[in-house]
Amino acid sequence: MLSNLPVIFLMGPTAAGKTALAISLCEHLNTEIISVDSALVYKGMDIGTAKPDASELARAPHHLIDLLDPSETYSVADFRRDAIIKIDEFHQQGKVPVLVGGTMLYFKALIDGLSPLPEANVEIRAELEAQAAQYGWPHLYQELVKIDPQAAQKMSENDSQRINRALEVYKLTGKTMTELQKQKQPVLPYTFHQFAIAPTQRSELHQRIEKRFKIMLEQGFENEVSTLYLRKDLHPNMPSIRCVGYRQMWDYLAGEIDHDEMVFRGIAATRQLAKRQLTWLRSWPDVTWLTTGDEENLHRVVSSLS
């Protein structure tokens, strides 16, 4: 059992080189990787998510990948629960857990905890949607302004998903979203060593994203998505199909866009994802930045543990 319970975070935008560094780190520390990626949890979605291949998995076992069928959903709370179980297992074995990925909300949930919000309720959602169909979302928004003005301030009067959720929470608990979000879980007893990796130039990251998307196409990404498309039980509003690249390929297979447009949109969506990830990281407290391709990266991470 490790005394100060160290946990390494290796965060960064998509295509920044996280996996390569993480595998080197695992070989050096004789440990394993916990994936922090909302797309890698899905089975049968390997190429478009850049899931580690067999040789990479042999060098460094990855956990929290291939957990679910693409028809299922995986919440932030599911991740937090599963990650804590794995972290504690590693600590019991005397290993330093290495958490790697770009789903920043998952990392945040580990550090800050989650509010005790209730599960979605189908009946209440349907009731609210029926009211919205009759009176419009701006009418329901005004209701929310009276109940929870602070939550309402953070959304527009046509943000149906968030208005619905805020009113649903109030109907289920009698408490506002704002009240419940202040009730966080206890802080975890770990020492977090937090690193973010990215190229210094945005143009380099864009080149890496474009190159990777084209490699995915060569590896058979179209066939991978076609298999999902032909199942008929999946649709583009599911979290799995909303993953970057999959949604654009889905639209192409549905005949809504041509091949060139699919490639253009796929690369553009991946760039947007990387931009959002970097925005999170620039305001992230206690993070040490690493430059993609720097030979000193491994040494910097390892030396932080001593």
Swiss-Prot record:
SUPFAM superfamilies: P-loop containing nucleoside triphosphate hydrolases. One of its GO terms (biological process) is tRNA modification. InterPro entries: Dimethylallyltransferase (IPR039657), IPT (IPR018022), P-loop_NTPase (IPR027417). Catalyzes the transfer of a dimethylallyl group onto the adenine at position 37 in tRNAs that read codons beginning with uridine, leading to the formation of N6-(dimethylallyl)adenosine (i(6)A). Monomer. This is tRNA dimethylallyltransferase. Its EC number is 2.5.1.75. It comes from Pseudoalteromonas translucida (strain TAC 125). Its cofactor is Mg(2+). The keyword Magnesium applies. Keywords: ATP-binding, Magnesium, Nucleotide-binding, Transferase, tRNA processing. GO terms for molecular function: ATP binding; tRNA dimethylallyltransferase activity. NCBIfam families: miaA. It comes from the Bacteria.
